[in-house]
A protein has these predicted regions:
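Active-site catalytic microenvironments for nucleophilic, acid-base chemistry
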Residues: 6, 10, 153, 171, ...
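Basic, Lys/Arg- and aromatic-enriched nucleic-acid-binding interface segment
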Residues: 9-83, 91, 102-106, 126-127, ...
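Active-site/catalytic core of tyrosine-dependent DNA strand-transfer enzymes
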Residues: 43-50, 92, 101, 111-159, ...
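C-terminal catalytic core of tyrosine-transesterase DNA break-rejoin enzymes
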Residues: 62-68, 72-79, 142, 146, ...
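Catalytic-site neighborhood detector that most strongly recognizes the C-terminal catalytic loop/helix
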Residues: 96-105, 117, 139, 174-177, ...
Length: 204
């Protein structure tokens, strides 16, 4: 844009600047800032997930259990590490994350699988605070480094914890007939259609 404006100012070209952003390209292209802020997290191919989960289930430590829970529930790191016993209904096998802890600001309900329930049972045996995965020194949530260190121990420096959400999304899209709307709801993503989102009241 600057180069063409310079040429136009020196009358080396005429007809306006086709690369002008304001009032021109801004009307048809996404904001450069949005593209700059968008990050892609390295993910494990879903074909390798069964083997990975088998190894992870045999790995000791709270970090390993937290990572398992994060993968099984397709939650964000902060959501899983901040999980409280008061949010979990063991009888009905549902984990309800309050809107205050959700990125989209909307309460998120997650049905708990048998594997997730097993992890909760293991953590309940060593319960020391209201947090499911507490820092043993102060009772607060364990740090993000806990799960990342597990990946390093398992020699998976090439992937990130957040990347497992992409693994989940890829599997659902390529191996199931699950509607996109349901998959997005499982990831607690906001509906793209603002009018539809305004009337959204249920879990799906």
């Amino acid at each position: 844009e600057a180069v063409l404006s310079y040429a136009e100012a020196h009358k080396w070209r005429t007809g306006g600047n086709p690369a002008r952003w304001r009032g021109h390209l801004s009307a048809i292209l996404p904001s450069p800032q949005k593209l700059k802020d968008r990050k892609h997290h390295s993910a494990l191919p879903y074909s390798e997930l069964p083997q990975f989960m088998g190894i992870l289930s045999k790995t000791d430590g709270m970090g390993a259990r937290a990572l398992e829970m994060t993968i099984l529930t397709a939650t964000r790191t902060k959501e899983s590490l901040g999980a409280k016993w008061s949010e979990i209904d063991l009888d009905n096998r549902v984990w309800t994350i309050p809107k205050e802890r959700m990125k989209a600001g909307i309460e998120h309900r997650i049905p708990l699988s048998s594997q997730a329930m097993k992890i909760l049972s293991q953590m309940a045996e060593h319960k020391m605070s209201d947090y499911v995965f507490p820092n043993r020194s102060n009772g607060k949530p364990m740090s993000n480094a806990g799960m990342s260190s597990v990946l390093k121990r398992l020699e998976h420096n090439d992937i990130t914890v957040h990347g497992f959400r992409s693994t989940f999304r890829d599997y659902v899209a390529e191996k199931t007939n699950t509607p996109e709307r349901t998959a997005e709801a499982a990831l607690a993503h906001k509906l793209k259609d603002a009018s539809e989102a305004a009337y959204q009241r249920g879990d799906l």
